[in-house]
Amino acid sequence: MKNFLCEDFLLSNETARRLYHEHAFHQPIYDYHCHLNPAEVTQNRQFDNLGQIWLEGDHYKWRGMRSAGIEERLITGDASDYDKYMAWAKTVPQTLGNPLYHWTHLELRRPFGITNTLFSPDTADQIWHQCNELLATPEFTARGIMQQMNVVMAGTTDDPIDSLEHHKAIAEDDTFNVKVLPSWRPDKAFKIELDLFADYMHKLGEVADIDIRRFDDLLSALDKRLAHFDSHGCRAADHGIEIVRYAPIPSEADLDALLARRLSGEVLSELECAQFSTAVQVWLGKRYAQLGWVMQLHIGAQRNNSTRMFQLLGADAGFDSIGDRPFAFELAHLLDEMDQTNELPRTILYCLNPRDNEMMATMIGNFQGGGIAGKVQFGSGWWFNDQKDGMQRQMEQLSQLGLLSQFVGMLTDSRSFLSYTRHEYFRRILCDMVGRWAENGEVPNDLSLLGPMVEDICFGNAKRYFEERA
């Protein structure tokens, strides 16, 4: 019987163990998509205590706490960090079977070095004091943790109107060797149905020094901001798409009219929203191709389901779930609009509903080519799927319907500096899967063949994919 979270955690066979310890473990982390606040890296934030660094902004943990009956005051309310931490300690023993239990103990092990101690109300005070002592040292600041975890690149998520002042400051700081690069998140520019759309057009126009009245004004403003992002090292865009919309792109005069009507406060039809969204996203995709950027499409979240809690806490507070709208037709046509002129950028497609895995794994095969290995990617198990079964499903389906060897691997998609252990979690699951294939005779049990593939999936593929500009 194995002990919990031993050195061979999740590694069920000898080949898996060798793949992980000899090939995966020491690979650097190329965290190409996250939601870290770059200001906290610039300022090298020193966290006051374990409760603060662990629970601040982590809606995964918040959902678990609510399900365990913890009152909101102890989750997002005005309770002290210690009281929130103790509420989390009360919750964790109830999360057995949920990845939260694994993540919690992995995060205590790395970087804090706490092993052979289960987190519970009985051990919480001891762990609180031990971790707080470490958090007061230079090795456990925001930058210190990134360096301890061997992070070489973190791609943040940034609005086109952002100044990127913090990314500039980090890039100019020779004392810090981790790249923190912006990623372009233009959702508010193509989701014309949003209540805040007109206000956002005003803000975008101000930053770009363009009065946005016509469709071409919008494209000019976006183009200025694209240049700004590119000059600050941006290599990726990310579109959050709850509903994939596609409609044939109308004339520029029609797009001008749609924009004018929306800016005046008129509500547009679903078809008109689809026409506008398609026009903007296709234009953006072609610009990404020209710039040598990667386009990421995160598809299928159903957001802000609780009106009451949205009004109380706002977005990204743990009230989102998996959507179930079909989107294969719309996605194929959206990508094809760019591909018809050979201007589809390197693209990563993520789906939140695992029902769509096989569809996505076959969709990427429609648009490969151009001499680029893995040009269009089926992204790693996202959000509700970044757990053992979800990540294994995604990789097995990719291997059966595409090329696992070209996969760009894991990303944290997280707001927490302690989430880098998710790369370890992913790597263990990857090595166990490949090791199992070898032990079953499904692939050659040859580490000279399997080892380099594992290394590439853990690091090399992502580095090449995001750093090549062609």
Swiss-Prot record:
This is Uronate isomerase. It comes from the Bacteria. The gene is uxaC. One of its GO terms (biological process) is D-glucuronate catabolic process. SUPFAM superfamilies: Metallo-dependent hydrolases. PANTHER family: URONATE ISOMERASE. Pfam families: UxaC. One of its GO terms (molecular function) is glucuronate isomerase activity. Gene3D superfamilies: Metal-dependent hydrolases (3.20.20.140), uronate isomerase, domain 2, chain A (1.10.2020.10). Its EC number is 5.3.1.12. Keywords: Isomerase. The keyword Isomerase applies. The lineage of its organism: Bacteria, Pseudomonadati, Pseudomonadota, Gammaproteobacteria, Vibrionales. It catalyses: D-glucuronate = D-fructuronate; aldehydo-D-galacturonate = keto-D-tagaturonate. Pathway: Carbohydrate metabolism; pentose and glucuronate interconversion. Belongs to the metallo-dependent hydrolases superfamily. Uronate isomerase family. NCBIfam families: PRK02925.1 (NF002794).
